Amino acid sequence: MIPTYCAETFYRYNPLMESSQEQPPSSARPTLWGNWREKNRHWKTPGNLSAIAISAENFSVLETPQDYRETLLALIAKAKQRILLPALYLEDDDGGREVLAALYAAKAARPELKIAVFVDWHRAQRGLIGKEKSAGNAVMYREMAQRLGSGIAIYGVPVQRRELMGVMHIKGFILDDTVLYSGASLNNVYLHRHQRYRVDRYHLIRSRALADCMAAVLSRTFAESSAVHALNTGSIPKTADIRTAIIEFRRDLAKFHYRFSANQIRQGEIGITPLFGLGIRGNKLNRAIVEMIYQAKNRLVLFTPYFNLPGPVRRAVDDRLRNGCHVMIVLGDKTANDFYISPNEPFKTIGAVPYLYEANLRRFCKSRQKFIVAGQLNIHLWQHDDNTFHLKGLLVDEHYALLTGNNINPRAWRLDVENGLLIHDPQRLLLEKHLAELDRILAHTRQLRSHEDLESMESYPLPVQRIIKRLARVRADRLVNQVL
């Protein structure tokens, strides 16, 4: 019988641990962890990374998308020195306009306040996928600047010459000395402005050192680049005209790392290591993700919105399973994917994407069924009415956590510019907060008992079946997975 776990039982009790700890590691591929460490021997393990020490009392977890929205608006209203908001997009809808109006109101009340928004260059200048063609959110930015003044800079950040090949995916809002870290962007569903919402993780951290460190990449590396241009003032150059600048900018980002003064973690404190990454070579965030998984001894929780694990992550998870580690993967059901189209609605090609992810998950579960049956691998699918799922990150044993916008998929691994915060908690000061967060997430999940709990391709809508078969026939499914 497959046991069902809440957050506390998952962390407090593992029926496999006593027997697995008494046995030597499996002989299957016994040198995988050793090979990884040998190849990356210059890379420090998570516990040895330099960190910014902060009081555990200055770290809090917000519970809902509404909390995220209300906290953001309150912080904007109170800010006295700076507001720097990086997001994939700030949408032209009620939620996005509410945030932008709050920024203009704060600037009017305190003219000395420095306010800048950073969005992806390409995403800001196109309409929504699957919708009618439009000039994108940049039209709203210019309209509000003409009406309310140009005191707010909204920068378009081009990571690549084409959106398909990479986007600006940096997270972490900086408001004075506070960092509001979430994978969420700024629109109706992320902010739960109306009835539907898109759930994410939301963390509030008060630290001048962390805020300064994360602000530097925005106010210097981004804003001062010749590839980055304001979208709400003056004329906007064509992407082709800044081609060389974009290439140089991406090259600089691939070498970038956060700079900060590290200090020792004292009683009552946790350590936070900000990480930055772009591309597959020298990517510190990617390395940290794999290192954290390999470091897991007893329990690993992995959040991902789209099941399409990069090869290094999949191999690390398999290694931990073979060595007795208890693994929980929490992801969205295909109906909780933002590209899901109900069978009752007209089908569009983009609607096949959630089914491709589910097919990946089905293959993954089928080949690891023995771990699922033993209760060692727990797969939880999130679904709540017609809302959507966007969580990502890691919880490792009781000492480490990762907050990130990285979807832990090949696209994030290779193409997009990402960041994250590695939390080192040697005194377990945040454990109860992590457990409470996990319980809230699991409340709307169902646990898979077998790969057969998932739909097979034969039950998919006919247009989806045709697309998947066509991709498989020319072996394009693997290529598609690299950019999803």
Each PLM stretch: what is its role?
Residues S26-S27, R41-K78, D93-A296, T335-D397, ...:
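HKD-type phospholipase D/PLD-like phosphodiesterase module
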Residues K80-L85, A296-V301:
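Short, surface-exposed connector motifs at secondary-structure boundaries
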Residues P86, F118, L175, S182, ...:
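Generic beta-strand/beta-sheet core signal
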Residues Y89-D94, F303-G311:
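Short, glycine-rich nucleotide/cofactor-binding loops
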Residues K114-I115, R299, R322-M328:
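Residues at the starts of beta-strands that form the adenosine-phosphate
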Residues F307-L309, K334-N337, N409:
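Short, catalytically relevant binding-site loops at active-site mouths
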Residues F371-L484:
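Long, C-terminal catalytic modules of enzymes
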